[in-house]
Amino acid sequence: MSRIQTRFAALKREGRGALIPFIEAGDPDAETSQTLLHGLPAAGADLIEIGVPFTDPMADGPTIQRAGRRALEAGATLAKTLAMVETFRQQDKDTPIILMGYLNPIETYGHERFCVDAAAVGVDGLIIVDLPTEEADLILPFATANGLDVIRLVAPTTDDARLPHVLNGSSGFVYYVSITGITGTVTASAEQLAQNMPRLRRVTDLPVAIGFGIRNPAQAAEAVRQGDAAIVASALIDTLAETLDDGRATDRTVPAVLDQVRQLAEAVRSARLSARGA
C-alpha cells in the first residue's frame, strides 16, 4: 500500500478522521517553511498538503495568493519544493505528503521528469487544480508508473453522471471542494455536507477529504463526521501572516501555526467519539 493508503487504513482502525493541514512551500521563506513542515506531524497532522507557488493560482483565495507571492519573492520554485520534501523525508518516513499546484510549472519542468523526481524525494500524491479530466493522461501514466496517487477534486456542482468520469484513475483520496468558488471564503453547512457525501460514497470507495472553507476546530470536526479528513489551508496561512513583520518571519511564526494545528487536531481526534457519545 502507498503511504496515503496506509495512513487512512490506520485511522480507520482507530475510528477517527484525518487532519490535513496546508502550507505554501517557501512562505514566508525557505527556512521557516522547512521548520514548519518538520513540526506539523508532532502537532497532529496526519497527512500534509504542500502548495507549490505559482504566479496565477486561479482557484486560490486572497490569503493563499498572498502566500504564493511571498514565497515567489523569496525565491520559491518547483525544484526547491521537491528539495523541501527530500529534507523532510530525512526525518519522517511515514507522514504522507501531497503536492497541490497548477499544471504550468509541471509542464515547464517536464511531466515525466516531475513524476520521477517527486516520487524519488518522497512525495506521495498530486493535486493538480487545473488539470482537466479529459487531459488527465498528461500526468496519470507517469504518476502511476512512479507510485504517485493522483487526487481529483469534485465539487457540489459535479453532477452524478459526471462523477465516475471525474474520478476515473483517481487514487489516494477524493478532495471534496465543499463550496463553489475560491479557497478560504465561505463554509459549507453540516446539512450541505450530509446531502453530498452519500452520492460520493456510491461511486467511490476512496476516503473523502473535505476542504475549502474549513477555518476552525468545530468546522474541522464536522468535516470528519461527514467525511474522512478535514483539509485546513487559508486559516493557517492567515495565522502565519499575522505573525510576520514587514513580510518576514518572527519568533512567533512557527509556534503560532503549530498551536493552531494542535487545536484542530484535538477537535478532529475527538469528533467521532463525541458523536458516538451524543
UniProtKB/Swiss-Prot annotation:
PROSITE patterns in the cross-refs: TRP_SYNTHASE_ALPHA (PS00167)
Superkingdom of this protein's organism: Bacteria
Keywords from the UniProt entry: Amino-acid biosynthesis, Aromatic amino acid biosynthesis, Lyase, Tryptophan biosynthesis
Pathway where it operates: Amino-acid biosynthesis; L-tryptophan biosynthesis; L-tryptophan from chorismate: step 5/5
Transmembrane feature ranges: none
UniProt KW Transferase keyword: no
Reactions it catalyzes: (1S,2R)-1-C-(indol-3-yl)glycerol 3-phosphate + L-serine = D-glyceraldehyde 3-phosphate + L-tryptophan + H2O
EC number annotated for this UniProt entry: 4.2.1.20
UniProt GO molecular function: tryptophan synthase activity
Enzyme class: lyase
Family: Belongs to the TrpA family.
Functional summary from the UniProt entry: The alpha subunit is responsible for the aldol cleavage of indoleglycerol phosphate to indole and glyceraldehyde 3-phosphate.
Protein name in the entry: Tryptophan synthase alpha chain
